[in-house]
């Protein structure tokens, strides 16, 4: 090979590496809203200095504070009754996400503006089914799905959403809003609509006597309660190499990559099957108890929530990958007792691949909630006890010991079980046609990431609480090799 061929090969390697980095950033959440800075546009620090959030001190660390609400107690009567003022030429619009035309407007806005790389190579592809699943959880309020339209044309140019969620932070459980999908049209970023949208959704949430919120961002705002890192598991090496997601290592071949990332043809855990509606009470009890081990977690106060998040997005028809399916949930049923001993689930969020001659969609799966009873004493495990966890209890029904509170023997059992569960769910994802399986360092994911061949991404996801002082919570991103679980038990879409 002459020097020109060598240079061309080097240039090609650089091009593919840069392309892969762009896609990794998208999957990691580092590139968002299509802005050139590659950050999630949740408002400038100047705006957040006016909000009831812990402030970053001069040393870069949050000031020592007592956990609890930041603002003085208020009532809905103290809240402004009229919407905030928008720039001239724009108007507020409450979005009916169940209306096909309006949900399509949100879908188009998000797909074209929410997340893409600077070269418009990849975009998140939110389906209508995904948005319905994400935004219509039990108790949702249509008033919390807020849009901004151009007055003359009625074109939807901005959106923000909130859904009700019960959050437990250590020993305290309280109602909150989960804020998501803040999106402003790329051509209107100079209008500073993001802070206006945040203020408006805050106003509407406060009118329902809810004063706290949880949200995430790939950038540092005042002030994260914890940070998780993204990891990715290759399921389709030929395609990921072809689109530039994964470089082909020097001296390697596609065949070697296929062998390296191959999975068995069938799940191996006895009793591993798809979750059914009749499993909901047992799954709910198991999931609540498992999440009690974390410092921050969704409370899942009733089984309606469990059914919605794990079953309502299962799609239509049966067998294989269903039409309109967005969530996959599997359980392990003890063959002898017929008790549910384990749960594992994931959801689908594909990305459109722009300007590629062969591929137009990256099928990405994201680890969702899971639980197993191996962390509990045999006498009280869900598989060996008839004692039910009260689904409607106001406080955690099991003392929150925090992940990492188990002894070494129990931790080893947990590690072994989670690796087995993850190995089986990777098989399901592969059979369903997914190209990559993504996971954060939350929950107990660190116990299986390395063994199941997940590779680290370069993105981090920061968790935030609005109007709640909170000591830092370990997001697990420093301890993947130590297989130490994190203290974050909330999975946000």
UniProtKB/Swiss-Prot annotation:
Q: Provide the organism lineage as a comma list.
A: Eukaryota, Fungi, Dikarya, Basidiomycota, Agaricomycotina
Q: What is this protein called?
A: Glycylpeptide N-tetradecanoyltransferase
Please report the organism this UniProt entry assigns to the protein: Cryptococcus neoformans var. neoformans serotype D (strain JEC21 / ATCC MYA-565)
Question: Which positions bind tetradecanoyl-CoA?
Answer: 45-48, 182-184, 190-194
Q: Which InterPro entries match?
A: Acyl_CoA_acyltransferase (IPR016181), NMT (IPR000903), NMT_C (IPR022677), NMT_CS (IPR022678), NMT_N (IPR022676)
Principal localization reads cytoplasm
GO MF term set = glycylpeptide N-tetradecanoyltransferase activity
Where it sits in the cell: the answer is: Cytoplasm
User: Could you describe the subunit structure of this protein?
Assistant: Monomer.
Q: What this chain does, per the record?
A: Adds a myristoyl group to the N-terminal glycine residue of certain cellular proteins.
- What is one GO cellular-component annotation here? cytosol
* GO BP: any one term: protein localization to membrane
Decide whether keyword Cytoplasm is in the record: yes
Which keywords, in A-to-Z order, does the entry hold? Acyltransferase, Cytoplasm, Transferase
């Amino acid at each position: 090979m002459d020097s020109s061929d060598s240079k061309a090969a080097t240039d090609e390697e650089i091009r593919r590496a840069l392309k892969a980095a762009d896609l990794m950033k998208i999957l990691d959440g580092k590139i968002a809203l299509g802005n050139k800075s590659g950050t999630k546009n949740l408002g400038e620090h100047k705006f957040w200095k006016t909000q009831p959030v812990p402030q970053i001190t001069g040393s870069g660390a949050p000031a020592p504070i007592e956990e609890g609400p930041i603002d003085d107690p208020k009532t809905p009567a103290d809240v402004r009754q009229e919407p905030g003022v928008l720039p001239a030429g724009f108007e507020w619009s409450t979005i009916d996400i169940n209306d096909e035309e309006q949900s399509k407007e949100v879908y188009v806005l998000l797909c074209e503006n929410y997340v893409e790389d600077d070269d418009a190579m990849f975009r998140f592809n939110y389906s209508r089914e995904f948005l319905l699943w994400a935004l219509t959880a039990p108790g949702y309020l249509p008033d919390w799905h807020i849009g901004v339209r151009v007055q003359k044309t009625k074109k939807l140019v901005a959106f923000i959403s909130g859904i009700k969620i019960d959050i437990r932070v250590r020993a305290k459980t309280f109602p909150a809003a989960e804020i998501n999908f803040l999106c402003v049209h790329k051509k209107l970023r100079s209008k500073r609509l993001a802070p206006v949208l945040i203020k408006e959704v805050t106003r509407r949430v406060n009118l329902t006597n809810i004063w706290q919120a949880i949200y995430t961002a790939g950038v540092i705002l005042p002030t994260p309660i914890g940070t998780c890192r993204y990891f990715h598991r290759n399921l389709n090496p030929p395609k990921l190499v072809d689109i530039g997601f994964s470089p082909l290592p020097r001296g390697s071949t596609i065949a070697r990559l296929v062998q390296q990332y191959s999975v068995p043809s069938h799940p191996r855990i006895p009793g591993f099957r798809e979750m059914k509606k009749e499993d909901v009470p047992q799954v709910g009890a198991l999931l609540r108890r498992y999440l009690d081990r974390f410092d921050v977690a969704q409370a899942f106060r009733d089984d309606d929530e469990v059914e919605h998040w794990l079953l309502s997005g299962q799609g239509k028809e049966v067998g294989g990958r269903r039409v309109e399916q967005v969530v996959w949930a599997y359980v392990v049923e003890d063959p002898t007792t017929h008790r549910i001993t384990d749960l594992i689930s994931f959801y689908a969020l594909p990305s459109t691949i722009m300007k590629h001659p062969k591929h137009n969609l990256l099928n990405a799966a994201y680890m969702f909630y899971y639980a197993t009873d191996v962390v509990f004493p045999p006498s009280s495990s869900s598989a060996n006890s008839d004692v039910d966890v009260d689904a409607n209890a106001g406080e955690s029904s099991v003392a929150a010991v925090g992940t990492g509170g188990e002894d070494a023997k129990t931790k080893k059992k947990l590690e072994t079980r989670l690796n087995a569960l993850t190995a089986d769910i990777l098989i399901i994802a592969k059979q369903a046609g997914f190209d990559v399986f993504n996971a954060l360092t939350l929950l107990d994911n660190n116990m299986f990431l390395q063994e199941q061949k997940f590779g680290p991404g370069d993105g981090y996801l920061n968790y935030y609480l609005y109007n709640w002082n909170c000591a830092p919570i370990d997001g697990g991103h420093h301890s993947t090799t130590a297989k130490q679980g994190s203290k974050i038990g909330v999975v946000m879409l």
